[in-house]
């Protein structure tokens, strides 16, 4: 047992950690990465030991911001460190690593220990990897979904009909929600949209919306905003909705994986937590996204529908074209600009963005009773073209604490590079994977001003020297890295009409 004085450390490691001077560890049974219980007069918290020579003095224990807040410790206060018991879920994680089926108790224990931070990032990574490799059956996924939802707040609504649209993501520039949500809200449909930040893409809906307004809303704020406007566009992590999901996402993000069991549970847990009764799930299909073909998409759709039935949520899925970025803008600020431009002048907006936003909104207008079957997309267009969707979007921005902006008022990165066509020809491919990696290299989504603006799409004719796309970054170093990567992976490919000359010589 160790008695040390707490020292404030302004550091976020994504897990609970205690930093101890190596002199205090000598001659003890404590080693780096050991799990310990930190106790004070106000409570206790579990963390993993990290040793240091200089960060804290002998007799001190460095504690992170989240830990100090969790048990209300004052800096300099004496705390007690002792060995913590191994988490109950460790053998259950090993069981899943061996490809076995987990029972409800085992699944609930794993989720509970994720939320209570009893599992280290290494242990959590093992669980995520095991579900990525070995998968889960529907009973396991349903149990995990319910428990993830139960670990956080649950929002109840006065209205019985509450709807939502959700995309499984993977498509760069997937900003459709900034059009679809205000269209639905303008039609009188209750649509409290909560989104995650980017996992595998350069910008999630929450990242894009954060360029324009506050997305970290509490439950009562969401209720107030939705009561006033019929809709919102918020980050799910700010509301303590399904907190286990956000912890899992933080482990998935560095390796850009989104295991299908976690994907299903993540999406549907948020629907339970936000009181959704009807939801449309967008499943992009194509090269460089999560789902490669229509057969895979249909299989996933059936899983969503089956999971929804077990949770009493009506689910309708749509397979959408995901073979290239949606619209021309990729990256938070650029996507926010393009969304506002589309709301202001939909006739001149990218057709792919308009068509997707209208299609998804149209389905929910029909499910919500605002339009007859087959007429939803027409009503969605009327709302968009009339300016009512823009008006509603600006109202949502204002209610969430922002100020409506013109597209040109949204700042982009100061460091800019235009990438030119090397030859005359046609654009034959735009790689989602390469575009995503280049935009991330430029700094997105953390750097909101970073991104790529495409000048042309697949099938367009270009001449040598034409601008194919422009890279933006808030950092000169990041821009150089993005340019170097782009030169290696060729996000946009141009080919002439003559592919190859073949003769017998």
UniProtKB/Swiss-Prot annotation:
Gene3D superfamilies in UniProt: 1.20.970.50, 2.40.40.20, Nucleoside phosphorylase/phosphoribosyltransferase catalytic domain, Pyrimidine nucleoside phosphorylase-like, C-terminal domain
Active site: 258
Residues annotated to bind AMP: 170, 196-201, 205, 266, 290
Top-rank taxon: Archaea
Keywords, comma-separated and alphabetical: Glycosyltransferase, Transferase
Pfam family name, one: PYNP_C
MF-aspect GO terms: 1,4-alpha-oligoglucan phosphorylase activity; AMP binding; pentosyltransferase activity
SMART domains given in the database record: PYNP_C
Tagged with keyword Transferase: yes
Enzymatic reactions: AMP + phosphate = alpha-D-ribose 1,5-bisphosphate + adenine; CMP + phosphate = cytosine + alpha-D-ribose 1,5-bisphosphate; UMP + phosphate = alpha-D-ribose 1,5-bisphosphate + uracil
EC number: 2.4.2.57
Similarity-based family: Belongs to the thymidine/pyrimidine-nucleoside phosphorylase family. Type 2 subfamily.
Biological role: Catalyzes the conversion of AMP and phosphate to adenine and ribose 1,5-bisphosphate (R15P). Exhibits phosphorylase activity toward CMP and UMP in addition to AMP. Functions in an archaeal AMP degradation pathway, together with R15P isomerase and RubisCO.
Name under which the protein is recorded: AMP phosphorylase
């Amino acid at each position: 047992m160790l008695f040390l004085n707490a020292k404030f450390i302004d550091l976020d490691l994504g897990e609970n950690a205690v930093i101890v001077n190596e002199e205090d560890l000598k001659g003890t049974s404590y080693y780096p990465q050991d799990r310990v219980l930190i106790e004070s007069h106000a409570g206790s918290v579990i963390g993993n030991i990290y040793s240091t020579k200089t960060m804290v003095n002998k007799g001190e224990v460095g504690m992170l911001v989240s830990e100090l807040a969790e048990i209300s410790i004052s800096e300099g206060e004496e705390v007690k460190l002792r060995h913590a018991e191994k988490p109950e879920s460790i053998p259950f994680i090993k069981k899943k690593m061996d490809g076995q089926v987990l029972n409800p108790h085992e699944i609930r224990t794993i989720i509970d220990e994720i939320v209570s931070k009893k599992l280290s990032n290494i242990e959590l990574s093992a669980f995520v990897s095991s579900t990525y490799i070995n998968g889960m059956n529907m009973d396991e996924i349903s149990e995990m979904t319910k428990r993830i939802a139960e670990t956080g707040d649950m929002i109840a609504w006065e209205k019985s009909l509450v709807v939502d649209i959700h995309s499984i993501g993977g498509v760069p520039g997937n900003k459709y929600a900034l059009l679809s949500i205000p269209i639905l809200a303008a039609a009188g449909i209750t649509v409290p949209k909560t989104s995650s930040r980017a996992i595998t893409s350069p910008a999630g809906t929450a990242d894009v919306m954060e360029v324009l307004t506050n997305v970290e809303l509490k439950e009562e704020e969401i209720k107030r905003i939705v009561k006033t406007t019929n809709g919102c566009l918020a980050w799910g992590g700010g509301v303590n909705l399904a907190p286990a999901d956000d912890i899992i996402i933080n482990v998935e993000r560095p390796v850009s994986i989104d295991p299908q069991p976690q994907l299903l549970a993540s999406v549907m847990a948020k629907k339970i937590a936000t009181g959704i009764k009807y939801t449309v799930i967008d499943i992009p299909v194509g090269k460089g996204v999560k789902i490669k073909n229509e057969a895979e998409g249909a299989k996933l759709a059936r899983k969503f529908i089956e999971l929804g039935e077990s949770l009493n949520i009506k689910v309708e899925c749509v397979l959408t074209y995901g073979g290239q970025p949606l619209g021309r803008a990729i990256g938070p600020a650029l996507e926010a600009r393009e969304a506002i431009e589309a709301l202001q002048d939909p006739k001149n907006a990218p057709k792919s963005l308009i068509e997707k936003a209208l299609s998804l909104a149209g389905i929910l207008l029909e499910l919500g009773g605002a339009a007859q079957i087959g007429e939803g997309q027409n009503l969605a267009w009327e709302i968009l073209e009339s300016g009512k969707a823009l008006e509603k979007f600006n109202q949502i921005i204002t209610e969430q604490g922002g100020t409506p902006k013109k597209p040109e008022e949204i700042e982009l990165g100061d460091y800019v590079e235009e990438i030119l066509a090397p030859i005359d020809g046609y654009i034959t491919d735009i790689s989602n994977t390469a575009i995503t990696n280049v935009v991330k290299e430029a700094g997105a989504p953390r750097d909101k001003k970073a991104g790529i603006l495409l000048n042309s799409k697949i099938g367009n004719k270009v001449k040598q020297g034409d601008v194919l796309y422009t890279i933006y970054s808030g950092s000169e170093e990041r821009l150089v890295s993005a340019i170097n990567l782009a030169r290696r992976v060729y996000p946009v490919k141009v080919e002439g009409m003559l592919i190859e000359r073949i003769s017998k010589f």
